[in-house]
Amino acid sequence: MPTADELYDRAVDCVAEGDLEGAVAAYKEALAVDADFADGWEGLSMALADLGRFDEAIAAAERVVALMPDEMLSYTNISRICQKAGDVPKAEEWAAKGRVLDWKQQLKDGKP
């Protein structure tokens, strides 16, 4: 049985080949192996968004935020998906959460 990383790599290859449906299938296979594989959820969210399947993409992106709440990129990604879906207020909300996280990290690191 392939590992989550191997299935993830297969999904990335599908994206590179323009096969987004194949990528979605491979990301889902990776997540069946490891349900907490944040990179798999991230890739799945992006592929789904590119397919216009925004509700599913947002749900996957929310899973990334839950798994990696201190990673600013996860907030940026979900904000981008919401904007692409036409939900600008929700996009701004997620972007603001990401900015607050960044500011907190800067304060923690002693940066002005």
Functional labels for PLM-detected ranges:
Residues M1-A4, R80-P112:
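Terminal, low-structured helical/coil segments at or just beyond the last alpha-helical repeat
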Residues T3, A16-K28, L51-R63, A85-K97:
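Structural signature of tandem alpha-helical TPR/SEL1-like repeats
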